[in-house]
Amino acid sequence: MHEMPEPGFPVKRRSFSLRKWSRDQMTHEKESSTSVLNRKAGWLSILIFRFFFRNIHTGPELKETMDRLPEDAIVLYATPRRSTLEFLFSWFRYQRMGMPAPRIGLDYKVIIFQPILRSIRIFFTRALYLLTHFRLADPYTTGFYRNRLMEGHTGFIYLSSKRGFERRFLKSRTDAFSHIIDLQKITERPVYIIPQTLFFGITPHRDTPSIIDLIFGSAEDPGKIRRLLTLVRRNNQKVFMDFSEPICLKDFLAEPEIKGLSTENQTLQLRRRLQKTFTLQRQSITGPVLKQRTELIESILTSEKVQRILEEEVRDSGKNLPAVRKKANDYLDEIAANYSMGWIKVYDIALTWMLKNIFEGISVDQKGLAKIRQAAKKGPLILVPCHKSHLDYLVLSYLFHHNKMPCPHIAAGKNLSFWPLGPIFRGGGAFFLRRTFKDNRLYARIFSTYVETLLSEGFNIEFFIEGGRSRTGKLLSPKMGLLSQTLSAYGKGVAPELSIVPISIGYDRVLEEKSYLHELGGGEKKPESMGQLVKARKSLKVRYGKVYVNFDNPISLNDYFAEKNLNPAELDKITHQEICTDLAYRCIHSINQVSVATPYGIVAGALLNLFQPTIPYARLEEVMEAYLSYLYRMDIRMADTLQVNPDYALRQVAEAFVQRGFVDAATENRDDLRIVLNESKRPILDYYKNNVIAFFIPAAYTSLAILEQDALQFTSGDLHLTYGRLTEFFNDEFFQDPDRSAELLVRKNLKAFIDDAILVPHPTLPDTYNVTASGLRKLKLFSAFLLTYLESYWVVLNFFMRYPKDTVAPKNRLKKIQAMGQRMSKRGEINRIEALSGVNYKNGLAFFLRSGLEGSEDKEAIEAHANRIQHYINLIVT
């Protein structure tokens, strides 16, 4: 007999509930969902993925992004379109990179790469759920996606698909983005969305597709066959994954214009922001839709704005409309580029060959370039490089093409539009402008409209802030024309954001050395021609060292105007000019700051700044060491060779100068080597010196201010007056940091001088310093960087001493000054032939005219300037 249970204690019967069992299984990812990938791939999957994904490249951006995210962040990768290929690639590749790999694909169904046993369990679990609930499980309503993401799994989400809108809008299914917004609202952990796009090439999308694009899909959105063929090609460099800045949902929902919206409207705004991000991301790599040149010209000429311009021109000029239209069309035909990927590839081949055979390679600031890539995802870039060589036209296009960025449209002088270079430059994105728009209102307005059109289309624009090439080796004063037009276009809202990028393009040696020396000596500039191109082939047999490209931080115009609390659309003429001037000089200073100090510049500076005909090599080494030490202390960027082995790099350059005849070696005994400077070669050495002179100008000003003190003991306050005078005196030659005062620069240089034992602080008196015995010689070596310019300005001042007011026409002044300089040099009144520089004369003339000199009648002012110049020269050389 069975014992009966005691009364009051009910019997617990075990019963099987199919509904409960299936619900329990649905909460376990391994049993239920096709949206979840295994933690690791199986051996067969690894073989397949390695074969198909081997040509897909990923840069360091993902790791850098992940390093910035909080440790407790919930992370989802987002793509513009639904793509199982991208989901599988991200899961497979990111695991191997040590990055969070997406395992949860919201609205994805991945069955084929699931383990067999798991696939069976998924089938039975989903079947049981269907039998018990009469519908398939919804991972949104069951909380499956939410729970997995909260547990630390990384998600994968897409913005759009062919059926996505129908699913959300017509069938009222849960929106994945609405789901993660709800998730952010219930957790303190930040949710981050990382936008990523898989690119199958960098060719710009054309508004007229080719037959191949129609059949197999475009490079932007390739069909399955095109994707497959692209992936399996050997050594294919075209396929890569690109990432944009992550979106923090917590910050997004806290934005004032988002905070008060309903979840539905917040989702809509999030989708719009992501769509804009993906659009700018693609545009930052492939560029905007590429139109035919004739189509672009027609669209400009038929625009309402140009129609109004033409009507005004008819009214003001009295010409008939057809004649004015023809003139406008001719202007645009003269200006417009003919951008072609074919010519970009030719540029690539040509510069690759030159860098390998003529130069010793190119050194690129990769960190700076990465910042530029991110800025390009917010709007068009305004690239503002310095200009030292015709090669500059190719360098940035070459770099951008190699780094998967759209090549810029480049502003070039009309003098370069000659055949055959004109069509070649146009094909690479060059558009041409005249040197002056004076007295041609129609041309000016057509040109500005063309620039506005390029920016509104989304093209990057490159122009040289100095206008023409610098023949002196240092930066020239900025020209405001194109920058002013860019600011006007920005004020008209042609783009939501523009970023100005100061860029330094430097060379150990430039190809145009000889022509620059000819022009600096007063020779006429020869117009560009095919004959010059043929003669230039002789240069191809010479090695020209390295090319250096460095980027400063982009200047966001949105941030710039926000900081100044100005509306760019409401600037008056004076404010516009002030803003333009400020930005121009900021660009010039930024370019100087990111330029590279080369061994050529340091050796040339040491040779020219020593005041002796024969220089012991040991003494030359001391001077070079002093200059190099200063550069290190001021954190100046160095050429690669100076970073690896500076002594060897400087010695190699000195030997190269001997081989080229710039200097002679007075003895073959290495222990007693003496250098004799070839006086006729001083101008070319001055060009190299000027490549680095901007780094030494604060030291030169500070040194000369110290030398001007009667005693070898002084306070920092004693130096400010002289420092300020020198800054004003050479305002057209050298450009001071707009964000640093003279007092700050003096303090910084005093610290560097103390570290180099040039100065010692007074033991008891505060802010008081003494010059050491060895320091006095070094102060003269630093201040010697100013000697050439002091002598040039002395020549200009002698012009004012000799000629009364209005006796020499303004256009003839420079010729008179150059002739006077030659005579003074022959009489021994000028000791440095490099001071006979037309550019220096021009800047000196501008300074004296600005200070009020008009002619020999201004005796008191002339005498004051003369005494000061001679005083400075004597302090340095005696």
For each feature predicted by the language model, list its residue ranges:
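Membrane-interfacial terminal anchoring regions of lipid-handling membrane enzymes
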Residues: 1-878
